[in-house]
Amino acid sequence: MSILVKNNIHWVGQRDWEVRDFHGTEYKTLRGSSYNSYLIREEKNVLIDTVDHKFSREFVQNLRSEIDLADIDYIIINHAEEDHAGALTELMAQIPDAPIYCTANAIDSINGHHHHPEWNFKVVKTGDTLDIGNGKQLIFVETPMLHWPDSMMTYMTGDAVLFSNDAFGQHYCDERLFNDEVDQTELFEQCQRYYANILTPFSRLVTPKITEILGFNLPVDMIATSHGVVWRDNPTQIVELYLKWAADYQEDRITIFYDTMSNNTRIMADAIAQGINEVDPNVAVKIFNVARSDKNEILTNVFRSKGVLVGTSTMNNVMMPKIAGLVEEMTGLRFRNKRASAFGSHGWSGGAVDRLSTRLQDAGFEMSLSLKAKWRPDLDALELCRQHGRDIARQWALAPLPETTQKTTPAEEITTCAAADLGPKMQCSVCQWIYDPALGEPLQDVAPGTPWSDVPDNFLCPECSLGKDVFDVLATEAK
């Protein structure tokens, strides 16, 4: 099946509704993807890119239903990655002499995947042209490291279509092809997710390359990407977004993510967020448990944020493995113009937070003071967490915040009041988790200072997920 793109240009690609992993398992394609290939029929017939290798046979069969394969005059490979050039072996078995136009770097990549150095490669550079008849030409623009060394774009004169390769695309599958036909919220979420997780390391190259392309003074009526939609309605809107995202992008947003062994670091995260909100209720704060969250969503939020707070329990004197992995990935993404702070709980040894602070600094973040708590945070420790959040809110504010008078209750008074009025601590008889009325359980909307008798009946133990009926009065407090 083909879809008319414009005049003599047809989409002959492949939708992939089921794909959920990309680049191994590093990118979660929660809304599927598409592999966009385009057939141009002028006096010369041109195929731009193929599809992912797993669809090779279907692609060639579908292409044969559109055109006699022997009538294809030129093949353009904008990018040698297997989701673009994966069907070349199947196709070239049918038309072995067809010329393949690509960059010099692409020849190395294509041969590395397909092992056919005898193919008829034609090397092109920025500014080279290819006459396709009817007064139209293809103009090639090299775009190295956006996002592979072999990458290029192809511009078609006359129809003013830019075949943009990975740039301006998104992993987004829909039966409809054009940007004005699909859900706009979904579309732009996937555009930003794609940029944040794939193109962020190359942001320093995005602006000069777009400037170079604009310098050709060529009209762009349509942008035909390699993944996702074709931009036909106001195509420059995505170009403007890329320029914005490439300029050390940040919103008035703070991302907190953590991993925890006994929920202690989670409690710290919640208290820090409360402190931030007390001082700056306008800043958006998002909290993620890395063990239960989509990694790419976390990284997209980091991309959007002015700062990030990263929490970890100490395990074997180092940070939790999922935190270490995510920080390593942030190092590779090379975020700029962002601040960071490490926090976490520990028992007899607290080496993780210091290691985490060093890793975040090595990743290019401007560091603020870290915060540690020993064992499960008590009232004093929770107040320190909230104060840390207040301090962070002021330090990271994009504009000066009004001064506020913080009313505090002495810790001794709180403790006395808690002991006198809140009743005993309760212990889960299954996993031994302890409910402290003075601390509550904020993640289940049980506020600090809530007696066990007032805890909702649908309360679940944070450790073993069993209900209130498995709790007993803590033995040390039983009378």
UniProtKB/Swiss-Prot annotation:
One of its GO terms (cellular component) is cytoplasm. Fe cation 2 binds at residues 83, 166, 227. Binds 3 Fe cations per monomer. Pathway: Nitrogen metabolism; nitric oxide reduction. Keywords: Cytoplasm, Electron transport, Flavoprotein, FMN, Iron, Metal-binding, Oxidoreductase, Transport. Residues 254-393 form the Flavodoxin-like domain. Fe cation 1 binds at residues 79, 81, 147, 166. SUPFAM superfamilies: Flavoproteins, Metallo-hydrolase/oxidoreductase, Rubredoxin-like. Homotetramer. Anaerobic nitric oxide reductase; uses NADH to detoxify nitric oxide (NO), protecting several 4Fe-4S NO-sensitive enzymes. Has at least 2 reductase partners, only one of which (NorW, flavorubredoxin reductase) has been identified. NO probably binds to the di-iron center; electrons enter from the NorW at rubredoxin and are transferred sequentially to the FMN center and the di-iron center. Also able to function as an aerobic oxygen reductase. This is Anaerobic nitric oxide reductase flavorubredoxin. The gene is norV.
